[in-house]
């Protein structure tokens, strides 16, 4: 990540680099926002992402998050989606992002109103 940031700065010193990665090394928090990777749209993935995000925070990575609602799999059932959103609002990176077409809160109807 330092190389990427240096390249952007060399290209234009008026631009502040912003990188997103799913893994890194000690010190990655100085260079990039980290997300937990492409997760499944299931209850277990929500549980595992909570543990992953807590671990990242304890490791000094303050700018982190996950794909709210899951990335791979069927569209999440309404209760699962609400729980993902409730968890996601406390993360610096809140992104409803998946291979499905329902990528906004409004795509899930009144369940989040």
Where are these regions (language model features)?
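Catalytic-domain carbohydrate-binding cleft regions of carbohydrate-active enzymes
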Residues: 1-113
């Amino acid at each position: 990540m330092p190389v990427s940031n240096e390249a952007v700065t060399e290209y234009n010193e008026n631009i502040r680099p912003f990188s997103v990665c799913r893994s890194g090394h000690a010190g990655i928090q100085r260079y990039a926002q980290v997300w937990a990777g492409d997760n499944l749209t299931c209850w277990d993935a929500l549980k595992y992402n909570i543990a992953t995000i807590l671990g990242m925070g304890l490791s000094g990575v303050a700018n982190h998050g996950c794909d709210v609602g899951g990335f791979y799999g069927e569209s999440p059932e309404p209760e699962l989606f609400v729980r993902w959103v409730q968890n996601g609002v406390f993360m610096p990176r809140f992104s409803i992002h998946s291979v499905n077409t329902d990528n906004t809160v409004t795509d899930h109807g009144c369940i989040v109103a």
